[in-house]
């Protein structure tokens, strides 16, 4: 396989075992700050995917609630393949800390009564949401919490 610029294109998706959380890479800035990018894989690549309304709501819930557990979250966003999310954090090299942040955030999802910013003013596709779907995804991930560190 030819080496590509995008890290995930160099990952053999037939060998991974979802769910997992793995460090994708570290980017260091000119002043020494470091961005840690994580692959939060929810579904098994090429076998399963998240339905868009559930994925969209889980994105909103995780983006909003994760910042209650970590003050240096840069972004959390869905993968185009609908099998997971990317999480970027600033200057935190603790994998265990990130696992705890994700766990706490998913517990928040289970307790949510609404999807944040689920309206036409704050969201580009407000009609495509499912709180129940997001909560089911969170429940599935939490039920397999002991597997998150096993990528292959």
Swiss-Prot record:
Transmembrane segments: none annotated. Gene3D superfamilies: S-ribosylhomocysteinase (LuxS). Its cofactor is Fe cation. The keyword Iron applies. Keywords: Autoinducer synthesis, Iron, Lyase, Metal-binding, Quorum sensing. InterPro entries: LuxS_sf, Metalloenz_LuxS/M16, S-ribosylhomocysteinase. Induction: Expression is growth phase-dependent, with maximal expression in the mid-exponential growth phase. Induced by high salt concentrations (at protein level). Its EC number is 4.4.1.21. Homodimer. This is S-ribosylhomocysteine lyase.
